[in-house]
């Protein structure tokens, strides 16, 4: 993840921006949302920050995890991304970054900041002929699929190449999102047969919505994939990098070598 190092998150959740004591309404707090988090995970982050503010700063913010989740559920996506099928998920639009807020800041106000930042960052993405929402969905998958910045455009290429050939994407992260299965719990045979539209083993094409809130590098990678013919990738034993190939046979060989089933 770029921009925010995971090991620094705990220390950076709440930043003291004023050197002297001030009335609660004037206290400045900071929340950092890392790239690739879901709305639910962002709501959990809000709850964590609130507890730190209460116990370390002796301030009780109006903002809560529950109010953030509720506001996100009723917030409309930007007009340019409204869908003909009436889906209104805000997932993908809550831009990951650091945000300042005060004790009286509401969830709707924080979300408005995130949407404003999304708009500013999105304008930096040159879409070419690709559909904006498709690019955002692909960016969210890139964010969840690789931790290595140099692999973003390669993962993007695999996704677009498989779509062009009418191949199922077969991305576990989409199924986990659809079923709410955490990353530390193995997918079961029952999970893999689930008919959720987020099951990209069973359903061709993109999932219905983004599966996370991506940062700018993943958005740019989604819009500009690497010019390679790769169709497969498998995670290496370091759990960070992947082996990429255009050959199913080579993919299966590497998968077996790394201890996975093909």
Question: What residue ranges belong to the model's regions?
Answer:
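Short, glycine/charged-rich beta-strand-loop motifs at protein surfaces that mediate ligand recognition
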Residues: 203-210
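Short acidic (Asp/Glu) and glycine-rich catalytic loops that position anionic groups and cofactors
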Residues: 135-136, 195-200, 233-235
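Short glycine/proline-rich, acidic loop/turn segments that cap or connect secondary-structure elements
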Residues: 187-196, 220-230
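Bacterial N-terminal signal peptides that target proteins for export
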Residues: 1-9
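Primarily N-terminal secretory
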Residues: 1-2, 14, 22
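Small-residue-rich helix-loop
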Residues: 149-197, 202
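Bacterial N-terminal signal peptides
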Residues: 10-18
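Conserved catalytic or metal-liganding residues and their short signature motifs at active sites
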Residues: 21-167, 214-217, 221-229, 237-262
């Amino acid at each position: 993840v770029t921009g925010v190092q995971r090991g620094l998150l705990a220390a950076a959740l709440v930043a003291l921006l004023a050197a002297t004591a001030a009335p609660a309404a004037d206290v400045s707090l900071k929340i950092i949302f890392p790239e690739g988090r879901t709305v639910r995970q962002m709501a959990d982050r809000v709850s964590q920050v609130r507890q730190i503010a209460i116990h370390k700063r002796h301030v009780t913010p109006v903002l809560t995890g529950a109010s953030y989740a509720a506001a996100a559920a009723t917030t409309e996506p930007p007009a340019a991304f409204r869908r003909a099928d009436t889906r209104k998920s805000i997932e993908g639009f809550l831009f990951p970054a650091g945000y300042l807020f005060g004790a009286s800041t509401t969830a709707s106000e924080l979300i408005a900041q995130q949407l404003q930042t999304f708009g500013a960052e999105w304008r930096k993405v040159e879409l070419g002929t690709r559909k904006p929402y498709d690019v955002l969905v692909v960016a969210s998958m890139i964010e969840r699929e690789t931790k290595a910045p140099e692999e973003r455009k390669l993962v993007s290429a695999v996704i677009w190449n498989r779509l062009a050939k009418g191949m199922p994407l077969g991305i576990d992260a989409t199924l986990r999102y659809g079923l709410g299965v955490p990353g530390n719990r193995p997918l079961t045979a029952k999970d893999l047969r689930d008919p959720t539209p987020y099951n990209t083993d069973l359903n061709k094409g993109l999932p219905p919505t983004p599966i996370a809130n991506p940062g700018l590098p993943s958005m740019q990678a989604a819009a500009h994939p690497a010019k390679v013919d790769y169709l497969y990738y498998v995670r290496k034993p370091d759990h960070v990098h992947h082996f990429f190939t255009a050959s199913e046979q080579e993919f299966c060989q590497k998968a077996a070598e790394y201890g996975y089933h093909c």
